[in-house]
Amino acid sequence: MAGHSKWKNIQRRKNAQDAKRGKIFMKLAKEIYVAAKEGGPDPESNASLRLVIDKAKNANMPNDNIDRAIKKASGSQDGKSYEEITYEGYGPSGVAVMVKCLTDNKNRTATSVRTAFSKNGGSLGETGCVSYMFDRKGYIAIEREDLEIDEEEFMLEVIDAGAEELETSEELFEIYTEPEQFEEVKKSLEERGYKLATSEITMVPQTYAEVDEALQEKVEKLIDVLEDDDDVQEVYTNVH
């Protein structure tokens, strides 16, 4: 699955400049608000809320911000109503792009996403045009620094926990699961004492497009423009 690009994207999110970090926290607060409003404020009984709280903590979002978003959802009878929409399209040279949004105005969001594609060498496509190239997976990364365990031993532990696939590098163990097994695997690894660098449900390309440096820069520019939109929660591509 060549997950290292997934890790790179997560690190990019974590290391965002202060101005961008504020926008990331705002988007995460929106996700927390929606999850708490739809499934209740208790993460113990609300799996969606548990997942987004983990995602927020991975992004170093302060606990006060997380609690505030949950309380806002709990005390709101009306409030804004957000709809989740995923747009699909093609970036420069036809690379596959999926854009997950939470919006209270579909027309505004569609126009904004379409403009981002068209001004950055891409085009917005029809529903289903690229989603078949991705699989929804659980993703867990564990940094190997100071971890005294060999790959074979760790692989046996991961398989025992219910994981689907393990990828290794000098710095990382990257674990993939079916979405239904994600929480079970995550809990098992935590109970064994592993510190998870990140854990989330994501979209993973079945194969990655090989691109040169110039095309990589164009794709990253498109991603930056899309991520700058307040309605855009996640951008997935099949580029390393």
Swiss-Prot record:
Gene3D superfamilies noted in UniProt: 1.10.10.200, 3.30.70.980
Gene Ontology terms for molecular function: DNA binding
Predominant cellular place of this UniProt entry's protein: cytoplasm
SUPFAM superfamilies per the UniProt record, alphabetical: YebC-like
Localization of this protein: Cytoplasm
Keywords, sorted A to Z: Cytoplasm, DNA-binding, Transcription, Transcription regulation
InterPro entries registered for this protein in UniProt: Integrase-like_N, TACO1_YebC-like_2nd/3rd_dom, TACO1_YebC_N, Transcrip_reg_TACO1-like, Transcrip_reg_TACO1-like_dom3, YebC-like
Biased segments, Basic residues type: 1-14
BP GO annotations: regulation of DNA-templated transcription
GO cellular component: cytosol
The UniProt record lists the keyword Transcription: yes
Stretches assigned to coiled coil: none
Region (Disordered): 1-21
Pfam family, one: TACO1_YebC_N
Family, as annotated: Belongs to the TACO1 family.
HAMAP family: Transcrip_reg_TACO1
Name of the molecule in the record: Probable transcriptional regulatory protein BLi02909/BL01150
Taxonomic lineage: Bacteria, Bacillati, Bacillota, Bacilli, Bacillales
